[in-house]
Amino acid sequence: MPTLYTDIEIPQLKISLKQPLGLFINNEFCPSSDGKTIETVNPATGEPITSFQAANEKDVDKAVKAARAAFDNVWSKTSSEQRGIYLSNLLKLIEEEQDTLAALETLDAGKPYHSNAKGDLAQILQLTRYFAGSADKFDKGATIPLTFNKFAYTLKVPFGVVAQIVPWNYPLAMACWKLQGALAAGNTVIIKPAENTSLSLLYFATLIKKAGFPPGVVNIVPGYGSLVGQALASHMDIDKISFTGSTKVGGFVLEASGQSNLKDVTLECGGKSPALVFEDADLDKAIDWIAAGIFYNSGQNCTANSRVYVQSSIYDKFVEKFKETAKKEWDVAGKFDPFDEKCIVGPVISSTQYDRIKSYIERGKREEKLDMFQTSEFPIGGAKGYFIPPTIFTDVPQTSKLLQDEIFGPVVVVSKFTNYDDALKLANDTCYGLASAVFTKDVKKAHMFARDIKAGTVWINSSNDEDVTVPFGGFKMSGIGRELGQSGVDTYLQTKAVHINLSLDN
């Protein structure tokens, strides 16, 4: 019999836990049908943590059947009020286990515990509280008078069985963005965590069961995207799929969904988000926000302000201060334990990502011969894991691959603009449209930018401080649909129209 649990010790926090390693189907942990496993690695050390069961197409079928049976027989008949109660139960359990969940995110994803992972759990608590209160409020239809003898009304009904695929940069937070909204709307779920970062969601499954959710309502199938993700996207008995990840893979999900049963699709994909700094901006505050917006989470953020455009009159001053802030506040050298409060910039997720980001840095330095500043020498001496120092390229032309491609690491490009029209043209010159930021004291200019930028989120005099009550999603190749806020429930509901004829003659 395969091992379905292992003991994990985190001595820095004096935390011991029993870590599930199996697939979670029908409220039970079980082995994969072929017994294959995936090894997960601590990105701060490059050393293995453990191995967990890897799902395949047969396991996906099993999970879908469990979700369908749960929806048809139990969950579709459960009141919205009761769904909210289950989510409230879950909220209490997350509060009790938040330190353990944050510790698993640090261990498995390399997130600095004090500055990142605990913040993720704070957001998870906020959004679970929000969706618990939303379950019996956002599923209401409307009455529409038509004529003297006719009216119509609408019903908001769940899709049924929903598949969700979540990324490795915010493993548990992104899972909860999707999972809690789908459950509040009345769907059953099969969710696939990233193969790099499955531990926290598998542990979270124990809380799902303790909260009282009926068997089959939530099913977790860790595994490789090319196998499990493909099986979910192409499955004929899944009614909707929600994906967060790269634009390339999002295209595969959309294609597979269209070629199977035309299931509804929500995509949150890549970004190359611009931050614009006008000459009237509070420069120190703008720099603090922009530094956090690119270096937080080691730049592994789809909304990271990885392109910075600065008005030419203040460009040199901005660059000088930006480098000083990066060195003073975000340097990684000698701070290689993500459980230590001194560690602010953790490792990137894997050797593959490390090599990919390194190749962009080398291209900028050697092939494009760009001006470059790094907070530490690179590779970093003494680092065992996948640590990359914050890296700033300046005077970067619009044609540069570093400016056009999503690098997904602590690498930022800085360029200058002359006036508003120039800034807007540069900011919109991308295939992406996830987020943007503008720094100015001119209220008119700020609102003009919010109107004119082609992006799903606009921050004015801040960056990357989203709120769970506000819709989130992208324009252009950054995605389809919205999550969070009321949209976080609406995206998992369909509208049905009912026509009532009161005339006795017709």
Swiss-Prot record:
Major localization class: cytoplasm
Domain of life: Eukaryota
Active site (catalytic residues): 268 (proton acceptor), 302 (nucleophile)
Assigned GO CC terms: cytoplasm
InterPro entries for this protein: Ald_DH/histidinol_DH, Ald_DH_C, Ald_DH_CS_CYS, Ald_DH_CS_GLU, Ald_DH_N, Aldehyde_DH_dom
Positions of the record's site feature: Transition state stabilizer: 169
Pfam family, one: Aldedh
Inducing stimuli: Expression is under the control of MSN2 and MSN4, and is induced during diauxic shift and osmotic stress.
Record EC number: 1.2.1.3
Protein localization: Cytoplasm
Keyword Oxidoreductase in annotation: yes
Known catalytic reactions: an aldehyde + NAD(+) + H2O = a carboxylate + NADH + 2 H(+); 3-aminopropanal + NAD(+) + H2O = beta-alanine + NADH + 2 H(+)
GO biological process: beta-alanine biosynthetic process; pantothenate biosynthetic process; polyamine catabolic process
GO MF annotation terms: 3-aminopropanal dehydrogenase (NAD+) activity; aldehyde dehydrogenase (NAD+) activity
Sorted UniProt keywords: Cytoplasm, NAD, Oxidoreductase, Pantothenate biosynthesis
Family the entry assigns: Belongs to the aldehyde dehydrogenase family.
Role of this protein: Cytoplasmic aldehyde dehydrogenase involved in ethanol oxidation. Required for pantothenic acid production through the conversion of 3-aminopropanal to beta-alanine, an intermediate in pantothenic acid (vitamin B5) and coenzyme A (CoA) biosynthesis.
PANTHER family: 2-AMINOMUCONIC SEMIALDEHYDE DEHYDROGENASE
Additional facts recorded: Present with 2070 molecules/cell in log phase SD medium.
Protein name: Aldehyde dehydrogenase [NAD(P)+] 1
The species this protein was found in: Saccharomyces cerevisiae (strain ATCC 204508 / S288c) (Baker's yeast)
Chain's gene name: ALD2
